[in-house]
Structure formats: C-alpha cells, structure tokens
C-alpha cells in the first residue's frame, strides 16, 4: 500500500529532511509517525501526496510509484488520499455541508450524489444536526470532525492526519482518535503524524519514530513507545 525504499531528501538550504528511510505500511493499517520538530514528519507527508519529490529512493502509494508519476496523473493520485490538518482549513463563509461538498464539486460529482455522500459522512462523524452551521459556530472538536468528513467523503484508500489533535483538549482529542479508529476499522489505511505521546499510548497502534530524518524505532504497539 505505502512503501518508502531508501528515501533521501535534502532541501535547498542543505538541511536533511529524510535520510535513507525505508518503511512499509500494509493496506488497512493504522500507523502513527512520531518525532520532534524537524524530525522529518512533514516531509514524510509531502512525499506521500507528491507535494515534494525525493532526491533518491522510491515512494510507492496505492501501488503507484509517485517518484515517476506524470504530472497529469497527480490529481488522480490525490483523489485516493484524504488529508486532515491541525488547523482544520475550513472555508469560513461556507456551511458545514458546503465545506464537505466542495471536495466532491471539484471532481465534478453529480449534485444528487454529492448530497447523498455528504449526508452519509455527516452521520458518520456525528454532525448531522450541524449541516447548515458555519465553522465559526462550531467548537474546535466539531470543526475537526468537519475536516475529517471532508477528507473521507470521497472514500480515500489512505487517510493522512497531520497533528489532528494538536489544537484540542485531551477529552476531545480522544473522541477524535476514536473516530479515526472507526474509519480505520472500515478498511481505510490511516497514517497519523503526531508528537502527542498521550495519544500514542491511547491509540495503541504501530509507531514509527523519526529523529533527524532517520527511522529510529518501529514498534507494533504505541503503549511501549516513550519519547526521550
């Protein structure tokens, strides 16, 4: 499903983002990628979505070699990925329904299908009664649920979450983590980047730890992982 083979990435300023990284993630796995600031977590995500390319090595996503993909095929790659960010990135002037529907409108889905898919995903994330609300009327946890709904409305094969609980209180963070578990249980591969060790222990999933652009640990259960 996802594979990094000896991936090396250096930015123009000379900083090494990833150094000889090899990772294999099976279809349907839930994997946490952890590390301090500058460890290489953000670059890892950017490589998955072809936002950046490696200087050497191979990146496979959904059985596609994204290091060799044609630029015309990148939008099709990204349609199979759902991405959730720490800062939600909702459109403030659009309702909850419209924010989620936007992800389908850009791929020219039919209005009837859009309505059905959006209502279904709103029920999944527990926001059926918030469809007509604006983001400013929602709590932080509710805004993140909208962002998650938008990311999964097109049924991606892989859901990528970049510090999704970073702006949330502990209980809301656990609620959001439970939602990611439910999405994973439905068959979606989940890759979550986080530095929140409480969430790592709570989720109790496979943990890949990065430090200085290298994989320093790859453990099958988060409860056994402790940040130095």
Predicted regions and their residues:
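Helix-to-loop junction immediately C-terminal to a conserved catalytic motif
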Residues: 49
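Conserved ABC transporter NBD signature motif
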Residues: 57-65
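A short, proline-enriched helix->beta-strand linker immediately N-terminal to the Walker B motif
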Residues: 153-157
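Helix N-cap at the start of a conserved alpha-helix in ABC-type nucleotide-binding domains
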Residues: 170-172
């Amino acid at each position: 499903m996802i594979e990094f083979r000896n991936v090396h990435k250096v930015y123009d300023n000379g900083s090494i983002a990833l150094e000889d990284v090899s990772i294999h993630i099976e279809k349907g796995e839930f994997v946490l990628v952890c590390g301090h600031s500058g460890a290489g977590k953000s670059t890892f995500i950017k490589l998955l979505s072809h936002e950046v390319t490696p200087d050497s090595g191979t990146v496979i996503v959904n059985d596609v070699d994204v290091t060799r993909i044609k630029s015309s095929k990148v939008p099709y790659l990204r349609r199979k990925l759902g991405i959730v960010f720490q800062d939600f990135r909702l459109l403030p002037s659009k309702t909850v329904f419209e924010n989620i529907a936007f992800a389908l409108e850009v791929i020219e889905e039919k209005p009837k299908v859009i309505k059905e898919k959006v209502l279904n995903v709103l029920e999944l994330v527990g926001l059926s009664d918030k469809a007509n609300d604006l983001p400013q009327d929602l709590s932080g946890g509710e805004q993140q649920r909208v962002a998650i709904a938008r990311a999964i409305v097109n049924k991606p094969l892989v859901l990528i979450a970049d510090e999704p609980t970073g702006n949330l209180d502990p209980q809301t963070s656990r609620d959001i983590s439970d939602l990611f578990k439910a999405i994973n249980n439905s068959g979606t591969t989940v890759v979550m980047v986080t530095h929140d060790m409480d969430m790592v222990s709570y989720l109790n999933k496979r943990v890949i730890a990065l430090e200085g652009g290298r994989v320093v640990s790859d453990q099958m259960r988060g409860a056994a992982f402790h940040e130095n």
